[in-house]
């Protein structure tokens, strides 16, 4: 299956976690990927690994908190490949020590958190839309989070910014659909990325597993498969949607077995 043959795909935060899995999935289907990551060292190493396997990829430094870096990423891609068919806005995150509950969160962190999770997605999309329009169409896939749909005891800024990503997805889809540009989002739940494995102990993982409808937690490749589907022609009649990838975590109230 070569759904991305002759396609140029930008993936932000591409050197690790969901981004790396998405990169592997797309190059396995013939896509050429710009590996944009804050860690140039990791991006270079990842690109070398994929290139040795025959993939056509380009690593580039990218800082999601700098608008200048967003513009440089698009310029780099056009210089290297001359086209952009898919943009995957994957990069995001938060600082748990500063992004707490509404009473105690650090408001000085607001701009950085929203720039990382929302402004970057908006600006990169703004930059690629004219390019995609000139080419006759394209795809944008945003990585949101179930934190943008539900709420938690902490991570207030993260949740609010990811909710913005979900609604931004609808706006982009509405405003660019007639230009043959689709825009969708994925909202992962707990995914066993290296970061999650390092920061969440076994007890926490068991709690999440107990509330999932599936007998297992998600892996990065589960999200990557969904992103690849949305970015491909298989999803040609889907736009403005957010696909939740959480093993059914958010489909029900907290439950216990009384039998």
Curated annotation (Swiss-Prot):
Positions bearing the site annotation: Transition state stabilizer: 145
SUPFAM superfamilies reported for this sequence: NAD(P)-binding Rossmann-fold domains
EC number: 1.1.1.159, 1.1.1.-
GO biological processes: bile acid catabolic process; lipid catabolic process
Residues where NAD(+) binds: 18, 37-38, 90, 158, 162, 191-193
Induction, per UniProt: Up-regulated by cholate and after the transition of the cells from log phase to stationary growth phase.
Annotated residues for binding of glycochenodeoxycholate: 145, 158
UniProt KW Metal-binding keyword: no
Entry's Gene Ontology molecular function annotations: cholate 7-alpha-dehydrogenase (NAD+) activity
Active site annotation, chain numbering: 158
Keywords: Bile acid catabolism, Lipid degradation, Lipid metabolism, NAD, Oxidoreductase, Steroid metabolism
Site entry (Lowers pKa of active site Tyr), positions: 162
Superkingdom: Bacteria
pH dependence: Optimum pH is pH 8.5 (NAD reduction, bile acid oxidation) and 6.5 (NADH oxidation, bile acid reduction).
Family from the record: Belongs to the short-chain dehydrogenases/reductases (SDR) family.
Function: 7alpha-hydroxysteroid dehydrogenase involved in the metabolism of bile acids in the gut. Catalyzes the NAD(+)-dependent oxidation of the 7alpha-hydroxy group of 7alpha-hydroxysteroids, such as cholate, chenodeoxycholate, taurochenodeoxycholate, glycochenodeoxycholate, taurocholate and glycocholate, to the corresponding 7-oxosteroids.
Record-given protein name: 7alpha-hydroxysteroid dehydrogenase
């Amino acid at each position: 299956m070569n759904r991305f043959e002759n396609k140029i795909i930008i993936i932000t935060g591409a050197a690790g976690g969901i981004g790396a899995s998405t990169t592997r999935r797309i190059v396995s289907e013939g896509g050429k990927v710009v590996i944009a990551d804050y860690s140039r060292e990791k991006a270079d190493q990842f690109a070398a690994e994929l290139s040795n396997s025959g993939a056509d990829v380009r690593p580039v430094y990218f800082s999601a908190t700098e608008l200048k870096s967003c513009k440089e990423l698009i310029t780099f891609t056009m210089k290297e490949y001359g086209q952009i068919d898919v943009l995957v806005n994957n990069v995001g995150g938060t600082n748990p020590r500063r992004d707490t509950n509404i009473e105690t969160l650090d408001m000085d962190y607001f701009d950085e958190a929203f720039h990382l999770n929302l402004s970057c997605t908006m600006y990169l999309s703004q930059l690629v839309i004219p390019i995609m329009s000139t080419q006759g169409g394209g795809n944008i896939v945003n990585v949101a989070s179930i934190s943008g749909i539900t709420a938690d005891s902490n991570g207030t800024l993260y949740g609010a910014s990811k909710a913005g990503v979900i609604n931004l997805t609808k706006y982009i889809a509405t405003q660019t659909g007639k230009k043959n540009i689709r825009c969708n989002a994925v909202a992962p739940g707990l995914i066993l990325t290296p970061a999650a494995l390092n920061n969440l102990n076994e007890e926490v993982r068991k709690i999440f597993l107990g509330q999932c409808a599936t007998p297992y937690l998600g892996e990065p490749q589960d999200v990557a498969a969904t992103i690849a589907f949305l970015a491909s022609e298989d999803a040609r009649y889907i736009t403005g949607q957010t696909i939740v990838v959480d093993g059914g975590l958010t489909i029900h109230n907290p439950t216990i077995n009384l039998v």
